[in-house]
Swiss-Prot record:
Source organism, top-level taxon: Eukaryota
Subunit structure: Heterohexadecamer of 8 large chains and 8 small chains; disulfide-linked. The disulfide link is formed within the large subunit homodimers.
Function recorded in the entry: RuBisCO catalyzes two reactions: the carboxylation of D-ribulose 1,5-bisphosphate, the primary event in carbon dioxide fixation, as well as the oxidative fragmentation of the pentose substrate in the photorespiration process. Both reactions occur simultaneously and in competition at the same active site.
GO cellular component, one term: chloroplast
Enzyme Commission designation: 4.1.1.39
PTM comment: The disulfide bond which can form in the large chain dimeric partners within the hexadecamer appears to be associated with oxidative stress and protein turnover.
PROSITE patterns: RUBISCO_LARGE (PS00157)
SUPFAM superfamilies documented for this protein: RuBisCo, C-terminal domain, RuBisCO, large subunit, small (N-terminal) domain
Residues annotated to bind substrate: N113, T163, K167, R285, H317, S369
Name listed for the protein in its UniProt record: Ribulose bisphosphate carboxylase large chain
GO molecular function, one term: monooxygenase activity
Coiled coil: none
Length: 465
């Protein structure tokens, strides 16, 4: 048997439309935009090849292994409705191509060099189906939704948070004071901003100490368990773990990590530490829009969300939906379900390309944060349900009477919405009315309603799909 050198079309080896996918395969849905003149089958096969065993030419060492066992296969291609020259290419990867328990390795293959490939004008990873056999090699979230509720002793409602602002420039003592005021007023959590690490104006150890003091003082006053997301993100893994260890020594309930800028290796390391030491882990997605904002290139956030659930985190930021388009609402709810639920059916109308079974991997609480205030509370309660964290930064600290009254206003609005929902009222239709009624017996809420009333609150009844 001679070795035949030379370049041959990818589709001869890597396009296999009659392939039956296995339960152990990792399946990927790519949005492919081929260069002019490149047929979609060749483009799809090129993606499968370059993200698995292929290279640009036939190599002598191909004969030393079994390509059929290890190659990625493009097994289906469909045009994207309403787009010219865009296709969804489905690729199946054999499980043996990936290291166990490593999101880093999975992404290095699937979204590695192939994204710079010349035969493609653009490439976007829309969704991944992670097989049960691979999921079982990951620890996943340190604790998950149920354990978190038990630790905090808070049930039957969303949790309330607030990012401390101004995010950069406060001294540690003033920062701690802002934390104390918010928690005393009725919030469950306050949060370090994602870019608060350890800067000259506030070193991490000072911040940790003052925030812990604020936490314990607010806890003693209110009789509720409180938390502050202490950001452990650092320049090295060792420094990150050092910060997490100090947080544990202070006895606080939760730390935080920026998982995309910090990287999946660091994130998984921290998640393991958190499970071993009883710390909850809040995840911020800084940098996600660099990766997921372009419609035709990069990676959809639902893939980053699935990767986080594998790598480990108990909370993750997931957009707010409010004020966005109806379609985006469905898509956001799609990946919110992927974060929280055990089993999610394929549903293309919500952007879910594959049925995903998470077996016993704990769920992640989605965090709604960014530009929300008390008038949004009915919509947020309806959209996200109980298993979520609602974070009002400016919506707390921007209250005309200060942080604590701002926190009171949010807590009153939330409790009113939860009670109304439990009584069977329709939050979508009666939201404004519910908030107005509640503000009659809460001067703090009335003041908040007055400040933000100009910011329109339009929440049509949800389209049921």
């Amino acid at each position: 048997v001679g070795f035949k050198a030379g370049v041959k079309d990818y589709k001869l080896t890597y396009y296999t439309p009659d392939y039956e996918t296995k339960d152990t395969d990792i399946l990927a849905a790519f949005r492919v935009t081929p260069q002019p003149g490149v047929p979609p089958e060749e483009a799809g096969a090129a993606v499968a090849a370059e993200s698995s065993t292929g290279t640009w030419t036939t190599v002598w060492t191909d004969g030393l292994t079994s390509l059929d066992r290890y190659k990625g296969r493009c097994y289906h291609i469909e045009p994207v409705a309403g787009e010219e020259n865009q296709y969804i290419a489905y690729v199946a990867y054999p499980l043996d191509l990936f290291e166990e328990g490593s999101v880093t390795n999975m992404f290095t293959s699937i979204v590695g060099n192939v994204f710079g490939f010349k035969a493609l004008r653009a490439l976007r990873l829309e969704d991944l189906r992670i097989p049960i056999s691979y999921i079982k090699t990951f620890q996943g979230p340190p604790h998950g939704i149920q354990v978190e509720r038990d630790k905090l002793n808070k049930y039957g409602r969303p949790l309330l948070g607030c990012t401390i602002k101004p995010k950069l420039g406060l001294s540690a003592k003033n920062y701690g004071r802002a934390v104390y005021e918010c928690l005393r007023g009725g919030l469950d959590f306050t949060k370090d901003d994602e870019n608060v690490n350890s800067q000259p104006f506030m070193r991490w150890r000072d911040r940790f100490c003052f925030c812990a003091e604020a936490l314990y003082k607010a806890q003693a006053e209110t009789g509720e368990i409180k938390g502050h997301y202490l950001n452990a993100t650092a320049g090295t893994c060792e420094e990150m773990i050092k910060r997490a260890v100090f947080a544990r020594e202070l006895g606080v309930p939760i730390v935080m990590h920026d998982y995309l800028t910090g990287g999946f290796t660091a994130n998984t390391t921290l998640a393991h530490y958190c499970r071993d030491n009883g710390l909850l882990l809040h995840i911020h997605r800084a940098m996600h829009a660099v990766i997921d904002r372009q419609k035709n290139h990069g990676m959809h956030f639902r893939v980053l969300a699935k990767a986080l659930r594998l790598s480990g985190g108990d909370h993750i930021h997931a957009g707010t939906v409010v004020g966005k388009l109806e379609g985006e609402r469905e898509i956001t709810l799609g990946f919110v379900d992927l974060l929280r639920d055990d089993f999610i059916e394929k549903d293309r109308s919500r952007g879910i390309y594959f049925t995903q079974d998470w077996v016993s991997l704990p769920g992640v609480l989605p965090v709604a944060s960014g530009g929300i205030h008390v008038w949004h509370m009915p919509a947020l309660t309806e959209i996200f349900g109980d298993d979520s964290v609602l974070q009002f930064g400016g919506g707390t600290l921007g209250h005309p009477w200060g942080n604590a009254p701002g926190a009171v206003a949010n807590r009153v609005a939330l409790e009113a919405c939860v009670q109304a929902r439990n009584e069977g009222r329709d939050l979508a239709r009666e939201g404004n009315e519910i908030i107005r009624e509640a503000s009659k017996w809460s001067p703090e809420l009335a003041a908040a309603c007055e400040v933000w009333k100009e910011i329109k609150f339009e929440f049509p009844a949800m389209d049921t799909l």
